[in-house]
């Protein structure tokens, strides 16, 4: 009588099981969102498909697009446009602070500025189509959108001012004077005020979002580039580029609590709090990294290597990825936030400046 090897018998049984009960890996749905990137030098937006990271469209919008944000429902993209020419970076002193000279490049740029190009561009996110430009004051650089989607709070860089614009009427309702080179804008979670970060002196202005009046101000080290609030509204984070540090602010009383040194070489730019409020991410500029901070302690947990001089950053609607605009390398880094690793780069020619991610309704 022929005998069957135990090994052959086991293999045969396994094959039978596989034939009767085939097992397939479950399909994983891709991210259902799109990413809009403002390209400062080419005057357009790059649209990236969140599912496969392909470039879905390029949308011409106007001169020097920088700050870019979405309406609360994600259906409209707003982008700051400016006719003021791009300047060479200012000379820095021994502490890394900019040196400004009367009659220098800043004055030349003002003389050459095309003020007719200034405004906020309005883009239909689903159709990926530029619709119109609305007034926004002189040289708008960045802005924030109110929680109800009715107003824009805008930093007017060359005017040392901040504008409040009614989107429906397309009119400037209030103009608040701040200090030199206002850039970052962030609205408090309760909507009652907004912060404006002013680079030159390190002033942070707190402005009433209804009246446009100054509530208070406080100072940090020079070149604060941006601000963001934790979801609960109790804390704000403001990076100081020159000092290479993060400022932690009591956002209830609008007072500086402490500063935290970032890793050596960091020149922090754009800050974003995670949707769950547990971590804070900041682009480190010339260091070519994203710094990850614990939101409770402000301790630096990790640094993530990305492209050249990351500027604007955005977190995907599902909270799983971070996108960083790398101006000098003309690309966008894609970071997996679970592993905190860069997983891809997508070309975005034209010096990418800002980035925003919204649900894809196509």
What are these regions, as identified by a protein language model?
Residues 21-362:
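Predominantly soluble domains enriched in secretory-pathway, periplasmic, or organellar proteins
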């Amino acid at each position: 009588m022929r005998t069957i090897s135990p090994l052959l018998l086991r293999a045969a049984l396994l094959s039978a099981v596989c034939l009767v009960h085939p097992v397939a890996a479950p399909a994983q749905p891709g991210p259902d969102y799109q990413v809009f990137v403002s390209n400062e030098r080419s005057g357009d937006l790059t649209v990236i498909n969140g599912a496969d990271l392909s470039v879905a469209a390029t949308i011409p919008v106007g001169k020097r697009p920088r700050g870019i944000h979405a309406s609360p429902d994600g259906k409209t993209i707003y982008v700051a446009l400016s006719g003021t020419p791009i300047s060479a970076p200012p000379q820095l002193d021994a502490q890394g602070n900019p040196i400004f000279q009367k009659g220098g490049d800043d004055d030349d740029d003002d003389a050459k500025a095309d003020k007719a190009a200034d405004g906020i561009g309005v883009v239909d996110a689903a159709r990926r189509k530029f619709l119109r430009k609305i007034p926004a004051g002189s040289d708008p650089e960045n802005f924030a959108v109110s929680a109800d989607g009715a107003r824009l709070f805008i930093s007017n860089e060359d005017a040392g001012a901040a504008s409040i614009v009614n989107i429906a009427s397309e009119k400037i309702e209030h103009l608040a004077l701040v200090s030199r080179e206002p850039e970052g804008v962030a609205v408090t979670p309760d909507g009652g005020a907004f912060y404006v970060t002013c680079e030159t002196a390190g002033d942070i202005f707190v402005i009433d979002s209804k009246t446009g009046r100054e509530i208070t101000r406080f100072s940090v080290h020079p070149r604060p580039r941006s601000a963001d609030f934790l979801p609960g509204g109790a804390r704000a984070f403001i990076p100081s580029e020159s000092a290479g540090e993060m400022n932690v602010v009591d956002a209830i009383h609008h007072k500086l609590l402490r500063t935290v040194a970032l890793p050596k070489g960091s020149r922090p730019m754009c800050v974003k709090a995670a949707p769950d409020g547990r971590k804070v991410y900041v682009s480190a500029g010339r260091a070519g990294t994203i710094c990850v901070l614990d939101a409770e302690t402000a301790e630096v947990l990790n640094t993530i290597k990305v492209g050249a001089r990351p500027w604007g950053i955005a977190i995907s609607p599902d909270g799983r990825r971070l996108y960083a605009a790398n101006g000098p390398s003309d690309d966008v880094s894609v970071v997996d936030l679970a592993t905190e690793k860069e997983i891809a780069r997508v070309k975005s020619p034209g010096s990418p400046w800002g980035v925003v991610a919204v649900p894809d309704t196509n």
